[in-house]
Amino acid sequence: MKFVIITGLSGAGKSQAIKYMEDFGYYCVDNLPPTLLTKFAELCYQSQGPMAKVALVIDIRGGMFFEDLFSSLERMTEAGYQYEILFLDASDKALIKRFKETRRSHPLSVDGSIPEGIALEREKLKELKQKAKHIIDTTNLRSAQLKEELNNIYVEGNQSNNLIISIVSFGFKHGIPLDADLVFDVRFLPNPFYIEDLKELTGNDKKVRDYVMNAPISVEFSNKLNDMISFLIPQYIEEGKNQLVIAIGCTGGMHRSVTIAHVLYNYLKERGYRVLMNHRDSNLSIGRKG
């Protein structure tokens, strides 16, 4: 029996996530009142067939009933009902933009203030986030990328106990990824920004990757990084960790970080690990140092 509780911040993508879970064969329920959680779990565990995999959304829309969630989770544990929590997060800036684009008000907004609503919701969800087995930061994820992450966790992830590794390239000027487990600074590597023919390209272009990796320091660093990650992965798997987010940053997130992300991605893929790669800032830094 697979029982997934999807929660997180308003505007972070829970409605989209539950649709994808349905595509993956889960029986899905959106906005279940927390007071009904234990009874619903009992029905699911007594059922067979389509109820063998269940995903449901519980969030702040439950209003006053949301306060009952923790007691409901305790009752589920006492009854022997196993569950896991998926928490969807995003930056304040991204959430505000999404609310403005959809012209919706935040469910906890005071006098229509979206930032105040987000801050209040973060505080209310802080303890729940700590209980989550999986946390997905959707700040820079397109819809298809969210589906890919969910697929790796809840479809491919069921096929083995291997770690799911997410490699994120980024620019320090845009901030470190919120969900990073490991952060590597590659601003000491040769910068293609100063080469006129490469300035407007990114590490997704072979010319840029060749320029960066032709430097002995880049090769040496890459080899040492590969060795370190190869050493760490079995340790994380042994302690039961199922997601590892490796963030690689340069100045603008355009050239060097993207290049090293590609090299590490290929290295891990060749060794059979399940790896995702996301170049968070590669399209934000055109014409800036990267």
Swiss-Prot record:
Task performed by this protein: Displays ATPase and GTPase activities.
Pfam family, one: RapZ-like_N
Descriptive protein name: Nucleotide-binding protein Clos_0574
Organism: Alkaliphilus oremlandii (strain OhILAs)
Keyword ATP-binding among UniProt keywords: yes
Record-level Gene Ontology MF annotations: ATP binding; GTP binding
Residues annotated as binding ATP: G8, L9, S10, G11, A12, G13, K14, S15
Keywords for the protein's UniProt record, in alphabetical order: ATP-binding, GTP-binding, Nucleotide-binding
Family: Belongs to the RapZ-like family.
Record-listed GTP binding positions: D59, I60, R61, G62
